[in-house]
């Protein structure tokens, strides 16, 4: 093992299980998202067709009540609602499983990240990375190991284009991502890089 590599085999069994659950949930969410989009695409097309036909007949002078009866959308609306309900029932426990893994992220991690983005100060971020490793059950890392991990992970994080309000009020054109986005991204980057 190279000098600046962290021995992740020291990770607690609970942490290892949670991180694997994060990866499995992320994959399951992606699969479900694709399934849901595939199911919704023809339903949305069907609804758009009904609405276009309705508008065409209304534009041609037919009474609204007659047009609604001629092109009912109840069946499509019910199918859309059913698809959405099924989708939400599938993703809810997966999202919860992912959020449960955020327990390993120190409370100050997001604040340290925003300080790194906004003020270009890394010290708090390095401390938060060290705390994260401790939360995983990995103690005794050197400053070099922590710095290397922080640097490797930081390459995957970023800022985003600021909203108009922030640009106008502060003259700042970039900003940190939200805490929810950061937590999800942090765990995803960590798992991609270090959990096999």
Model segments located where?
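Short intrinsically disordered terminal tails
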Residues: 1-3, 195-196
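Eukaryotic intrinsically disordered, low-complexity tracts enriched in Ser/Pro/Thr/Gly and charged residues
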Residues: 3-7, 103-104
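Short, charge/polar-rich alpha-helical segments
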Residues: 5-42
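Extended alpha-helical coiled-coil "stalk/arm" regions
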Residues: 29-108
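Charged, polyampholytic interaction/assembly segments that form long, compositionally biased interfaces
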Residues: 108-196
């Amino acid at each position: 093992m190279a000098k600046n590599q962290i021995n992740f085999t020291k990770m607690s069994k609970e942490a290892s299980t949670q991180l694997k659950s994060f990866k499995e949930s992320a994959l399951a969410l992606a699969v479900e998202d694709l399934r849901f989009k595939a199911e919704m695409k023809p339903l949305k097309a069907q609804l758009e067709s009904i609405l276009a036909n309705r508008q065409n007949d209304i534009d041609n002078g037919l009474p609204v009540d007659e047009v609604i009866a001629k092109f009912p959308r109840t069946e499509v609306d019910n199918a859309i609602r059913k698809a959405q309900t099924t989708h939400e029932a599938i993703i809810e426990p997966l999202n919860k499983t992912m959020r449960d893994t955020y327990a390993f992220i120190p409370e100050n991690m997001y604040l340290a990240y925003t300080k790194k983005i906004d003020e270009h100060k890394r010290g708090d971020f390095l401390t938060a990375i060290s705390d994260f490793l401790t939360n995983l059950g990995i103690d005794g890392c050197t400053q070099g190991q922590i710095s290397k991990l922080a640097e490797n992970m930081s390459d995957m994080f970023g800022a985003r284009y600021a909203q108009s309000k922030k640009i106008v009020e502060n003259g700042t054109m970039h900003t940190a991502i939200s805490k929810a986005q950061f937590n999800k991204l942090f765990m995803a980057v960590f798992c991609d890089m270090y959990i096999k």
